[in-house]
């Protein structure tokens, strides 16, 4: 009897309930049919080395992410929840994924060159070996307050002709997660999508805050149609930002301020507050519950605590629901009244 070969794709399908739960914890939803289509067809046709049977290799996942997060019309915002869930399974694997992880790469450190050992000096019992005396050091004089000395730590260096030296190294940045590293690398290249990352785990699993920059907001606004023209496209963009960046409450307001008009923001917030769940899971009409779950003024949510992160996760989900609700625009009756039946046209 033949044996069924287990692949990363078939493994995720066998544990689909856990995959969906993992995606839900990140604030997104994934569907099995699209999960299979992306893995077996669309990501394979990107020609970046993605195998049809799937993989938990971070190198392959990063190559697919570059295509998905490409700016403007070249990206695929609708695929963000799926590749983000793949990465989550690879970076924080459950027990059933660990046997299928690729082996870690060996360190690429170069071997230290062998330096010849100095030969021992010839000694003799007739002549004692005298220790070598260090050359005399010049005396350290206290600075003369009247002398025009330059403080090299505070003065700017003089201009040099033709920069041929190595570029100056920038300040060291705190350690961030693989997604944060990927997004920050793209920020160095202005031709690619902006890479702000408001909230990610740093050293000791403590969240660190990276605010949006003006260039991030400008690129998102200039490379995408307005909400009134194509609400679905802009909603997909904002969804990808909410998933990958995990913004705080203030960041969400800044994002809405940059991408939506005042009237559009009011519609989105109104639709989102209609979806606030009550104790039974259905939308509630209790003002205190609505204000606590989806506040219009800055809440006292600490993203460094589990409770604060849970508040932010639910807030981002409701904000996305508000965007989808506001995208369903009502019929403009004024435009309907402008339609006049022609003389040769039938009422049908």
Curated annotation (Swiss-Prot):
Residues linked to a lipid group, N-myristoyl glycine type: 2
Keywords recorded for this protein, A-Z: Capsid protein, Host cell membrane, Host membrane, Host-virus interaction, Lipoprotein, Membrane, Myristate, RNA-binding, Viral budding, Viral budding via the host ESCRT complexes, Viral matrix protein, Viral release from host cell, Virion
GO terms assigned for molecular function: RNA binding; structural constituent of virion
Residue ranges annotated as motif PTAP/PSAP motif: 118-121
UniProt biased composition (Pro residues): 100-119, 136-146, 156-171
Positions of region (Disordered): 97-208
Top-level taxon in the UniProt lineage: Viruses
Chain location of the short sequence motif PPXY motif per the record: 157-160
UniProt-annotated site: Cleavage, residues: 127-128, 197-198
Bias type Low complexity, positions: 120-132
GO terms for cellular component: host cell plasma membrane; membrane; viral capsid
Gene3D superfamilies to which the protein is assigned, alphabetical: Gamma-retroviral matrix domain, Human Immunodeficiency Virus Type 1 Capsid Protein
GO biological process: viral budding via host ESCRT complex
Transmembrane intervals: none
Note: This protein is synthesized as a Gag-Fes polyprotein.
Protein name: Gag polyprotein
Native source organism of the sequence: Feline sarcoma virus (strain Gardner-Arnstein)
Gene responsible for this protein: gag
């Amino acid at each position: 009897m033949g044996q069924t070969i287990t692949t990363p794709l078939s493994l995720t399908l066998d544990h689909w309930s856990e995959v969906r739960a993992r995606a839900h914890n990140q604030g997104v939803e994934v569907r099995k049919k699209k999960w299979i289509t992306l893995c077996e067809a669309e990501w394979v046709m990107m020609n970046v080395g993605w195998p049809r049977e799937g993989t938990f290799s971070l190198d392959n996942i990063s190559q697919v992410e570059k295509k998905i997060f490409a700016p403007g019309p070249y990206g695929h915002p609708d695929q963000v929840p799926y590749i983000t869930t793949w990465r989550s399974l690879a970076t924080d694997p459950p027990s059933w994924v660990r046997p299928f992880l690729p082996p870690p790469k060996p360190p690429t450190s170069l071997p230290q060159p062998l330096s010849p050992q100095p030969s021992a000096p010839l000694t003799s019992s007739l002549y004692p070996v005298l220790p070598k005396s260090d050359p005399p050091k010049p005396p350290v004089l206290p600075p003369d307050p009247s002398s025009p000395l330059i403080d090299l730590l505070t003065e700017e260096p003089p201009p040099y002709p033709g920069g041929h030296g190595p570029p100056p190294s920038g300040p060291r940045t705190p350690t961030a997660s693989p997604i944060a590293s990927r997004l920050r690398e793209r920020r160095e290249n202005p031709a690619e999508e902006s890479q702000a990352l408001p909230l990610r785990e740093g050293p000791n699993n403590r969240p660190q805050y990276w605010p949006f920059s003006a260039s991030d907001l400008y690129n998102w606004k200039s490379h995408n149609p307005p909400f009134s023209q194509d609400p679905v496209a802009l909603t997909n963009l904002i969804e990808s930002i909410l998933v990958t960046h995990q913004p705080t409450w203030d960041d969400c307001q800044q994002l809405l301020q940059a991408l939506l008009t005042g009237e559009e923001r009011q519609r989105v917030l109104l639709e989102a507050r209609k979806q606030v769940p009550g104790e039974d899971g259905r939308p509630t009409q209790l003002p205190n519950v609505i204000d606590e779950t989806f506040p219009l003024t800055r809440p006292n949510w600490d993203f460094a605590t589990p409770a604060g992160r849970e508040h932010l996760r639910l807030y981002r989900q409701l904000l996305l629901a508000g965007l989808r609700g506001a995208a369903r625009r009502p019929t403009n009756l004024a435009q309907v009244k402008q339609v006049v039946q022609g003389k040769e046209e039938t009422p049908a």
